[in-house]
Amino acid sequence: MVNLEPMHTEIKMSGDVADSTDTRSTFGQVEPGNDRNGLDFNRQIKTEDLGDSLQQTLSHRPCHLSQGPTMMPGNQMSGDMASLHPLQQLVLVPGHLQSVSQFLLSQTPPGQQGLQPNLLSFPQQQSTLLLPQTGPGLASQAVGRPGLSGSSLEPHLDAPQHLPGPKHLPGPGGNDEPTDLEELEKFAKTFKQRRIKLGFTQGDVGLAMGKLYGNDFSQTTISRFEALNLSFKNMCKLKPLLEKWLNDAESSPSDPSASTPSSYPTLSEVFGRKRKKRTSIETNIRLTLEKRFQDNPKPSSEEISMIAEQLSMEKEVVRVWFCNRRQKEKRINCPVATPVKPPIYNSRLVSPSGSLGPLSVPPVHSTMPGTVTSSCSPGNNSRPSSPGSGLHASSPTASQNNSKAAMNSSSSSSFNSSGSWYRWNHPTYLH
């Protein structure tokens, strides 16, 4: 602790010109070997009216600021300060820091005196740990430039005391969230396994929860819960309901006496939709049933009962197996049993009323007169079909029947109904 009693007697004077001269003489006594530094400090001193509150400031502040030089030797501070601005060469010896602190404290405005209780509230060990680390920086900020006022330098002196405080304290529930996520993941897996073991679908669970607890959930919601595809908040809300339903579902068939009569009538309705498990039949039993099916594909009820007793199976299982086997036999034998229908284009060739197409009649030559006359359109019913009639329509009956469809009264008018392809292919057509 630095003894400041000589300076107290000098600063308790009133704020006139005589006080300023006495203060200058005081600084001159503290620093007899540094006249230049004393002159620089005399230029920065401003005379102000110092009251009782300033005396309290002088009595408290030096104890915080004077601890920095005690922790750091003077040669280390001078080495750190050598690279700074030439105006910062004032603080080179521990004795200079005291004068600087006195100068800064003398410039403290009355508005910043409310910060003193906060500085006193910090323990002495904390300030001892902070000031050795921030000593050079604190000194360089305090004596930055001669033009800076004391009020602008005060926040730099107070800031290092607040830096080591933790900005974000870990909340008490920060470590619980991963645990909750792990618990939710485990519960979702166990819930899915137990639900399948009980034989319930996801839709059954949603309907059961709607009937029992009044909260309707869809099959999609249950599926997303099992897949961990819901938000953390919704999964936390859904977990106790699903856990309660699972406990009720497991305790209902095994211990019906433990349930209340008001709750489990609804449970029995829900459990009535319980899905049946898929029946797996062993290989030797399946071979025996195949032999019985080859002998009698449709056994009677008595025969089904007898087969079930022989194979130690349920009658309903044997009956369902025979039904499924008959359906399988129908699917296998269906294409072979039905007759093959003729193609559609064959019926056009056989039909007497069908029109002639390019594929139905081959090109007609003079050597095949019978084919042309017998396969003409139905409008030529009275046409003679004998080969001796010839290709040319010389008889009057043939010309009368073809008068509507004739384009001209030429010798080939009887074949106009056969289409343009016949006129082009006929040897008598003039190209």
Swiss-Prot record:
Name of the featured protein: POU domain, class 2, transcription factor 3
Domain of life: Eukaryota
UniProtKB keywords: DNA-binding, Homeobox, Nucleus, Transcription, Transcription regulation
Region entry Disordered, spans: 1-39, 130-180, 248-267, 352-419
InterPro entries cross-referenced by the UniProt entry: HD (IPR001356), Homeobox_CS (IPR017970), Homeodomain-like_sf (IPR009057), Lambda_DNA-bd_dom_sf (IPR010982), POU (IPR013847), POU_dom (IPR000327), POU_domain_TF (IPR050255), TF_octamer (IPR000972)
Tissue specificity comment: Skin, thymus, stomach and testis.
Predominant location: nucleus
UniProt DNA-binding region: 274-333
Function field: Transcription factor that binds to the octamer motif (5'-ATTTGCAT-3'). Regulates cell type-specific differentiation pathways. Involved in the regulation of keratinocytes differentiation. The POU2F3-POU2AF2/POU2AF3 complex drives the expression of tuft-cell-specific genes, a rare chemosensory cells that coordinate immune and neural functions within mucosal epithelial tissues.
Gene from which the chain derives: Pou2f3
Family of this protein: Belongs to the POU transcription factor family. Class-2 subfamily.
Gene inactivation effect: Mice homozygous for null mutation exhibit defective keratinocyte differentiation, however the skin and coat appear normal.
SUPFAM superfamilies: Homeodomain-like (SSF46689), lambda repressor-like DNA-binding domains (SSF47413)
An example Gene Ontology molecular-function term: DNA binding
UniProt feature, compositional bias: Low complexity: 251-267, 352-364, 374-390, 398-419
UniProt organism field: Mus musculus (Mouse)
